[in-house]
Regions:
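Catalytic Zn2+-binding segment of zinc metalloproteases
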Residues: 83-103, 109, 115-126
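C-terminal capping/extension segments of zinc metalloprotease domains
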Residues: 1-57, 62-67, 120-212
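Extracytoplasmic/secreted proteins, especially bacterial periplasmic and envelope-associated proteins
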Residues: 14, 18, 74, 78, ...
Length: 212
């Protein structure tokens, strides 16, 4: 294992441990069990939330942690988003006219939970232990300067942009058509209906920006 991979494994286990301490009891209040399915040795890309046999599980494959563009910030957004599928509430995902995953929050709602509930907890804790290092100049020349918590706001915005960049590079860029989602750009369309089975073309960035 390379030094970089060792570092990735350490911060992944730290993040999983912290999120478990924050949300395990809240999930168990629903009457269900909770588990992590983290396979460091898997070369594949993948992360998700499942509900089977009265157990909520968050799946994380090692290839995701080690992928190009992934770091602690990107992993934080990824795992907070997956917890959002479990605890984010309505609206819930729907695939087709009949099949509704009434346990799983819609993609945008999961992003909202991540930005408003989970990522602030991650920022506060890991800033205190030194894994997140930000200086007062971090949020200069940013709209976050107008918020009550500019450093946290800017970290979450940057982490979310990096998350979107990684998704774009892996899954979307190859189509040669879809533009890269950017914090500095408005979505090209006005949303008329809540999307419960997918993202709009601008991905999750707009949702995160609106939280701050």
């Amino acid at each position: 294992m390379s030094p970089k991979e060792s570092q990735q494994l350490v911060y992944t286990t730290q993040l999983i441990s912290f999120l478990t301490s924050q949300y395990q009891d809240e999930i168990k209040i629903t009457g269900a069990n909770f588990s992590w399915k983290f396979d460091w040795n898997s070369p594949y890309l993948g992360a998700g939330a499942t509900f089977l046999d009265n157990t909520y599980s968050i799946v994380l494959l090692g290839g995701t942690v080690r992928s190009t563009g992934s770091d602690f910030d990107v992993l934080s957004v990824t795992l907070c988003h997956e917890i959002g599928h479990i605890l984010g509430g309505a609206p819930h995902q729907r695939f087709g006219d009949q099949l509704e995953e009434d346990w799983s929050s819609a993609e945008g709602q999961s992003d909202w939970f991540a930005a408003s509930q989970c990522l602030p907890k991650v920022f506060q804790h890991f800033k205190e232990v030194g894994l997140i290092n930000v200086s007062p100049s971090f949020a200069e020349n940013s709209t976050c300067q107008k918020t009550a918590r500019p450093l946290m706001c800017e970290w979450i915005r940057n982490a979310s942009q990096k998350f979107s960049d990684s998704i774009y590079e892996i899954y979307i860029k190859s189509d040669g058509v879809t533009p890269r989602p950017m914090l500095s750009l408005d979505a090209p369309e006005v949303v008329q209906n809540t999307l419960v089975g997918t993202y709009p073309s601008h991905d999750n960035v707009d949702t995160v920006v609106q939280e701050y």
